[in-house]
Amino acid sequence: MAKRDFYDVLGVSKSASPEELKSAYRKLAVKYHPDKNPGDKASEDKFKEAGEAYGVLSDKEKKQNYDNFGHAAFEGGGGRQGGGFGGGFGGADFSDIFEDFFGDFGGGQSRGRRKTNNRGSDLRYDLSITLEEAYEGKKQDIKFSTTEKCNTCNGNGSKPGHSPDRCTVCGGNGKVRSNQGFFTVQQTCPQCAGSGEEITNPCTDCNGQGNKQASKKISVTIPKGVDDGTRIRLAGKGEAGSKGGANGDLYLFVNVHSHDLFKRSDENLFFEFPISIADAALGTTIEIPTIDGGKAKIKIPDGTQNGKQFRLKGKGMPYMRGSGNGDLYVQVNTEVPISLNKEQKALLEKFREIENEKSNPSIKQFFQKAKSFWKN
């Protein structure tokens, strides 16, 4: 079968830059790599074909020969080979292409012993507080289960007086090699999980793990103004890492209980206060509670309508990030009386007889609009 044009194989033009060649090859190599397509002969052939094309076009001298003479430049017996292709990939460097995908790649020397330090797991703790506690902020002791570094072996997993041995599978490199077509791929050692070490004399307290289960108690600070659903990160308070790895983090998820009187929206609080028809009509002064445990007075002017809001500046929740407080909004709800006695009914009947349109402007406007609607 005739070989395909190398530029067609990579899907690039003859004027493609080295970066464009590398990018095109990487996409094909990742797509058709045998590790991603085990047992797929067609993918393996395309993988090899792409590698052959890139091996030529990425080399300046070979590319020039190919541009001048095509595939004939690399056929045996000719004097035009300029070092030859020889069926392999010559001096092309593929390691940088696969570094982020496969780790150390190719048949080169190992970059030295690599120890895998495993970071500890993050933990979650759900903490419930009242709205008053969210207003004031608080310190609280919490207790939770976690893992801590074993003090007996100082976290290395070996008995006191012993040290981990070099892994017998990877020789301490943390990686093993396997052949994939034209390539030799270095992968994480399955025996030592990349640490390069084996525990041959395990610590009896932690069974060679380096960590132990523990119950931990710490004091946490809940800042003023914390809202429901706030997540607080406590760095390094999670589970212990292994093989010298860093601890994970502890995340506090704050649940602020709903309040019987106050409703919250961001840093503002809302409060509903019922008043009688007489107080709404004649005006009055009301006294309301505030979230800090104090009291505040509000003057209700005569003629106050149902649902009217009054703003008390700075009487809301503290800003969690910054200074100052939100506001408290008090909404007055006019309550219509029920179960009236004879005297109350008589007074209201008298009031109905003497009330006029001026006293009820909204009613007057409504009937004016209604009459206009009915006429039309």
UniProtKB/Swiss-Prot annotation:
Q: Classify the main location.
A: cytoplasm
Swiss-Prot/TrEMBL cofactor(s): Zn(2+)
For this protein, the record's InterPro entries field holds: DnaJ, DnaJ_C, DnaJ_domain, HSP40/DnaJ_pept-bd, HSP_DnaJ_Cys-rich_dom, HSP_DnaJ_Cys-rich_dom_sf, J_dom_sf
Q: Which SMART domains match?
A: DnaJ (SM00271)
Keyword terms: Chaperone, Cytoplasm, DNA replication, Metal-binding, Repeat, Stress response, Zinc, Zinc-finger
Q: Where does Zn(2+) 1 bind?
A: 150, 153, 203, 206
Tell me which residue ranges form CR-type zinc fingers.
137-215
Q: Where does Zn(2+) 2 bind?
A: 167, 170, 189, 192
Report domain J positions: 5-70
Q: List the PROSITE patterns.
A: DNAJ_2 (PS50076), ZF_CR (PS51188)
Among the GO molecular function terms of this UniProt record, one is: unfolded protein binding
**Alphabetized NCBIfam families for the sequence:** DnaJ_bact (TIGR02349), PRK10767.1 (NF008035)
Record's subunit section: Homodimer.
The entry's family comment says: Belongs to the DnaJ family.
Q: What does this protein do?
A: Participates actively in the response to hyperosmotic and heat shock by preventing the aggregation of stress-denatured proteins and by disaggregating proteins, also in an autonomous, DnaK-independent fashion. Unfolded proteins bind initially to DnaJ; upon interaction with the DnaJ-bound protein, DnaK hydrolyzes its bound ATP, resulting in the formation of a stable complex. GrpE releases ADP from DnaK; ATP binding to DnaK triggers the release of the substrate protein, thus completing the reaction cycle.
Its name, as the record gives it, is Chaperone protein DnaJ
* Organism annotation: Pelagibacter ubique (strain HTCC1062)
